[in-house]
Amino acid sequence: MESRGPKLLDRVRDAIRARHYSRRTEAAYVTWIRRYILYHHMTHPATPGAADISAFLTWLATKQRVSASTQNQALAALLFLYERVLHAPVGSVEHVIRAKQPLRLPVVLSREEVAMVLSHLDGTMWIIGMLLYGAGLRLEECLELRVKDVDFDRRQIAVKRGKGQKDRTTTLPGAVVDSLRTHLAHVRRLHEGDLKDGGGRVVLPDALDRKYPNAATAWAWQFAFPASRICTDPRWGPPSRFHLHESAVQKAIAAAARR
C-alpha cells in the first residue's frame, strides 16, 4: 500500500498554522491523524472515509478505553483532515460506539481553599493564580495575554478570543496590580535584551505580521507571561518567544494544592 504519511502530515501542519491554532492543538491533531493512518495499515486516506473513521473511533472506545473527550478530539482531528486538508467532506459519521462520559461533579473551591492555594504560590505563578481565581480567566486566556491587553488605568483586562471565540473584558484585581507592574517591567527588560540580540519577535494572531511587519517586535504585542527560552523551530518561522507553557502552571498549582 502506498504511504505518504510524512507529506500528508506536513500539509496538516500547514493548514493548522494557516488558521493560527495553538501548538497544543497541532500536536494533538497530528498525533490522531498519524494513529488513524497506522490503524488502517499505512493506507493514505485519499477518499472520504466515514466508515473508516467510524471503525477507528469504535476501536478507540472498545479496545483503547479512551474517554469521551479523547474520542471527540480524535473525531475533530479527522474531520479537519478530510474537510480542511483533503477537501473531501465525509458527511455523517455513523455507527460509532461512543466512549462513556464519566459522571463528575464540578470542583468548586471555597474562598478559603483558593486563599490556601494562592498562599503557596509566589512570583509569576502567584500573579497567574490571582488572574485565574481573581479575574476569572481560563488558563489559556491568561497565558495568551499580551502587554497591550492589560489596562492599569481602568483596572481592566481585555480577553481576546476567549471562551466561544468571543472578546470580553474583565476586572484586574487590585491586589495584583503592583506585582503585575513589577513583573511586566522585568518582561520589558527581557524583551529589550532580545532586541539587542537581534530578536524580540513574538508570534502574532491572524497573520498580523504580514499586515504589520514591525508588530512582531513591538512591546505592546509581547506576551505578558513569556517562555524562558526562545523557540528556534524553523517550522514556526523566525526565532520567537512563545508564552509560558500550560503544564508549568498546572504543575505549580497542583503542587500548591497538595501542601
Residues covered by each model-derived region:
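Conserved catalytic core of the tyrosine transesterase superfamily
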Residues: 1-259
